[in-house]
Amino acid sequence: LARAAGTNLQITALDPAGAVSWSNAYSNGVCTVESMAAPTNVGRFGAWIPQQNFFTTNPSSQGNFTPPAGNQFFRLRAVDLSTNSPAAFTNLINSYGILHTIAGNGDAGYADPGADVTNYWKPSFEGQLATNVALSRPHFAMEDDASNVYIVDKDSDSVLKVTTDGRIHTVAGIHSISNGPDGPTIATSVGMNTPNGLWVRGDGTFYVLDTGNGKVRKVNTSGIMTTLFTDSKGISGGRGLWVRSDEALIYYASGADLRRWTPTGGTVNLNTQFNDLGNIIMSGTNLVATDRGANTVWLVNTNTGVRTLLCGSGGEGLVVDGTPALTNSLYGVRGVWQPPTGGYFLADDYGAQLVFVDPAGILHLFVNGNNDDHAGDGEWFYQPAHYLFGQLRSVSMDNQGNLIIVENDEGYVRRIDFQRLSQ
């Protein structure tokens, strides 16, 4: 950690509730608020403890953290993530900390863990610790601004919610295949059919790609579900879903087709040149889409539908760390997320690797994996020589910078803390 080169990095305001402002940070970097307890004896100072990281995209900004109890000293540190810095990737990995499992027990106790088209849900799971519960091929997880994690659990035909106390609750679906009503109905009374796409707003409103029924459904903060639209052509494959906050624009995946829906124009194909789409995100005014079947990642112009290759050679091997993303095999790539400072996190299904592609297009191995491996809980996430993940389904980022990953046929949701470890 170092002072931003050539600047006077400083805290400009700090209140007791943890609202902090700063100036002269890196315009592409991370700021870390650290604290140290005031000494009880003269000269007996303790260690500086990282409290909160913030991505920085401007020299001056602000954020909020929870101050520790008691009298404290505070300081602000900064690192550069720009590709002009030779330490950019090192700075990124050192800004992340511990790997956790937050949901799933690997279908423990079942003779056929991780089997496709198998519903492992039991009524007794309701309200239990999420790490004691068997998931059924979960496909995507995303967090709201209150730190609740929503999971679309494909083969239990439901959406599950892990609350901040670590317990799991059904928030949509009846845990069996059905085609529930389209009008306003309590979400836990509405049957769905292999839902596998999800989009969550900060206030806890969420949207579900009810793939088997060819529908996009909404659940409001009162737990009421309505169908926004039904695709008359049906939805094949599914997975990718993105919803604008005013609900007037929705993009979703259907096999080879990337589709757009608006209230006035209905459903149209934006691009039909894919093999087997995975997840999608918005990047500026354009879309980024993964093609699991072609092992590639594309930028799609939302006005014309024209696509441009971003990452992937189409090969079926493992990635080569530190080399151009365009020349790399991204075997079964299906997850994608963009951090505030640019670049992309990509999650490979068959390759079982989580990678980061920096803004210069260089690929870096972030977390290694293999088949159905699952390891590393409670440890620093960056262990490239060890397999910590199984096959990956998705990656997303919450509003605090933590990474949420769905991995392994046997059903786990993991989190990597955006929290620097103490030195």
Feature locations, PLM:
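Short, composition-biased motifs enriched in small/polar/acidic residues
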Residues: 1-95
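Blade-level signature of beta-propeller repeat domains, shared across WD40, Kelch, NHL, RCC1
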Residues: 391-423
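Short loop/turn segments immediately following the C-termini of beta-strands
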Residues: 154, 211-212, 253-255, 292, ...
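Conserved beta-propeller blade signature
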Residues: 148-151, 205-208, 249-252, 286-289, ...
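Residue-level detector of Asp-centered blade-edge/turn motifs that repeat once per structural unit
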Residues: 143-146, 200-203, 243-247, 282-285, ...
